[in-house]
Amino acid sequence: MANKMNLAFSALSENESFARVTVSAFIAQLDPTMEELTEIKTIVSEAVTNAIIHGYENDPNGQVYITAELKDRELELIIRDEGVGISDLDEARQPLYTSKPELERSGMGFTIMENFCQELKVISEPMIGTTVYVKKQLTTTKAMCR
């Protein structure tokens, strides 16, 4: 049986931790390992930070949307903004690329997300926004003994 949640919040940097914790609480029902939980929190953090800093350019009037769906032991995440979009996705997905070097960002967000999931798809259109699709399979071994 699938279980689904939807979340929308203002594009404020202080809401990044809120998004991370909310998704973590949602997947807790599957009793993920600490490693899986850390990876999921990192994926959410990277995608939400990208939406706030790059998509909305720190405009708090923007909204970030997250949908999380659990099917068996698979997590599907959709993190979406309606910001400025990404003009060159191939370039943006290159390790160490950043569109804001003045912020001393490492440009590793997409690379990190790719390494922590089974599937990462990014769709973006200039002046329409960006949607990040993530699929992550959780191990069959649960974190705690029952």
From Swiss-Prot:
Q: Where along the sequence do coiled-coil regions lie?
A: none
Q: Which InterPro entries does its entry note?
A: Anti-sigma-factor_SerPK, Anti-sigma_F, HATPase_C_sf
- Gene Ontology MF terms: ATP binding; protein serine kinase activity; protein serine/threonine kinase activity; sigma factor antagonist activity
Asked if Mitochondrion is a keyword of the record, the answer is: no
Query: Which catalytic reaction applies to this protein?
Result: L-seryl-[protein] + ATP = O-phospho-L-seryl-[protein] + ADP + H(+); L-threonyl-[protein] + ATP = O-phospho-L-threonyl-[protein] + ADP + H(+)
Q: Does the keyword Zinc-finger apply?
A: no
Reported EC number(s) for this entry are 2.7.11.1
Cite the Pfam families for this sequence. Answer: HATPase_c_2
Provide one Gene Ontology biological process annotation: sporulation resulting in formation of a cellular spore
Q: Which UniProt keywords are given for this protein, alphabetically ordered?
A: ATP-binding, Kinase, Nucleotide-binding, Serine/threonine-protein kinase, Sporulation, Transferase
| Protein role | Binds to sigma F and blocks its ability to form an RNA polymerase holoenzyme (E-sigma F). Phosphorylates SpoIIAA on a serine residue. This phosphorylation may enable SpoIIAA to act as an anti-anti-sigma factor that counteracts SpoIIAB and thus releases sigma F from inhibition.
Family annotation (NCBIfam families): spIIAB
The family note in this entry says:
Belongs to the anti-sigma-factor family.
Record PANTHER family: ANTI-SIGMA-F FACTOR RSBW (PTHR35526:SF3), ANTI-SIGMA-F FACTOR RSBW-RELATED (PTHR35526)
Would you tell me the protein name for this molecule? Anti-sigma F factor
Look up and give the organism this protein is from. Answer: Shouchella clausii (strain KSM-K16)
Q: Which gene encodes it?
A: spoIIAB
